[in-house]
């Protein structure tokens, strides 16, 4: 159903993440129903794998689990909700930008191209809240984890 590589999820995730998976997947399921048209147009983008990859990359503590600053100080559920809705809204933006020519695909693989688009918005290089310059690693790390986690 989820088309995931459970061995890699176990191997490349920390034990603290394992207990979060049911909640994260329930939220993905909930919003997948609400945004069914987006999901249907982009069946190749695995939101389960993407959610786990972003959670692992952000590695945030309580109240900032997904790195969503707009929901800072909340909890895993609220962070996951903001993250999943952000993924879905950015799929729409990516589709529109690609269609209108303001985004030139950078990968032949649509999934990796979308993650690149998302990463430019989610973790922009040179952002004021990234003084150590770690955002430069966000896109390649999320792409790698995404591919490891999906089947």
Functional labels for PLM-detected ranges:
Residues 5-8, 13, 44-47, 62-65:
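Poly-acidic low-complexity segments
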Residues 33-43:
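Conserved interaction-surface patches within small, structured recognition/assembly domains
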């Amino acid at each position: 159903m989820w088309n995931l590589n459970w061995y890699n999820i176990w191997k490349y995730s920390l034990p603290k993440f394992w207990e979060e998976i049911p909640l994260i997947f329930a939220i993905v399921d909930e919003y997948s129903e609400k945004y069914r048209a987006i999901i249907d147009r982009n069946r190749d983008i695995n939101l389960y794998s993407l959610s786990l990859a972003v959670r692992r990359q952000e590695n945030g503590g309580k109240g900032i689990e997904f790195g969503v600053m707009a929901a800072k100080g909340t909890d895993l559920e609220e962070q996951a909700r903001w993250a999943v809705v952000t993924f879905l809204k950015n799929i729409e933006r990516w589709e529109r930008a690609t269609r209108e020519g303001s985004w030139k695909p950078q990968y032949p693989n649509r999934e990796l191209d979308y993650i690149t688009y998302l990463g430019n918005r989610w973790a922009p290089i040179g952002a004021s809240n990234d003084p150590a310059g770690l955002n430069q690693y966000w896109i390649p790390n999320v792409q790698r984890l995404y591919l490891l986690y999906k089947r």
